[in-house]
Amino acid sequence: MSDNDELQQIAHLRREYTKGGLRRRDLPADPLTLFERWLSQACDAKLADPTAMVVATVDEHGQPYQRIVLLKHYDEKGMVFYTNLGSRKAHQIENNPRVSLLFPWHTLERQVMVIGKAERLSTLEVMKYFHSRPRDSQIGAWVSKQSSRISARGILESKFLELKQKFQQGEVPLPSFWGGFRVSLEQIEFWQGGEHRLHDRFLYQRENDAWKIDRLAP
């Protein structure tokens, strides 16, 4: 098969969206109510990693970067994730805190996009979550200098065993280079796949203490 033939096959990959639509009359005034409903349905549907979200940032040159992380908490203040503070995404957020999040629930023919500003979590919030993690995950946080270049996986594995021995007694301390961010809720867009590619899109935008809701063309 030639490269052109393979490209033609990819171009014809498609499916119809048949899960149902999203109507304005069914929307709650608060987008978190709809988000919670959709997230609950994603969990009930046994989707793999229903809390997985794409976090998009930009560097100082305007170059976009994306990666998947797990949502760990959400409320009216924003959506929370944790990371190594020496990572590329953390440095980019420090330089430009404007980010977007995307929840891709393909099986349900849905996606949710959040736009807002990321702020560092307090040490108290980070410590509370850190010590709720499995012990090996706590140790793993100490091992990796995230986004740095390494010559072999064995370096990480050896470091993990070394630190597991070091921290075998008592509580694993919180690394100073490990923390989290809360992304404020400025805009939230809900997308539901529709028949004939007539998808339903609704954008919530915060205006003072209320939310403005607009339908967007697909």
Curated annotation (Swiss-Prot):
Annotated family: Belongs to the pyridoxamine 5'-phosphate oxidase family.
Gene3D superfamilies: Electron Transport, Fmn-binding Protein, Chain A
GO molecular function annotation: FMN binding; pyridoxamine phosphate oxidase activity
InterPro entries hit by this protein: Pyridox_Oxase (IPR000659), Pyridox_Oxase_CS (IPR019740), Pyridox_Oxase_N (IPR011576), Pyridoxamine_oxidase_dimer_C (IPR019576), Split_barrel_FMN-bd (IPR012349)
Entry binding sites for substrate: R14, R15, E16, Y17, K72, Y129, R133, S137, R197, L198, H199
Name the UniProt record assigns to this protein: Pyridoxine/pyridoxamine 5'-phosphate oxidase
Annotated GO biological process: pyridoxine biosynthetic process
Domain of life: Bacteria
Cofactor field: FMN
Record's cofactor remark: Binds 1 FMN per subunit.
Catalytic activity: pyridoxamine 5'-phosphate + O2 + H2O = pyridoxal 5'-phosphate + H2O2 + NH4(+); pyridoxine 5'-phosphate + O2 = pyridoxal 5'-phosphate + H2O2
Gene of this entry: pdxH
Keyword Secreted: no
Organism name: Escherichia coli (strain SMS-3-5 / SECEC)
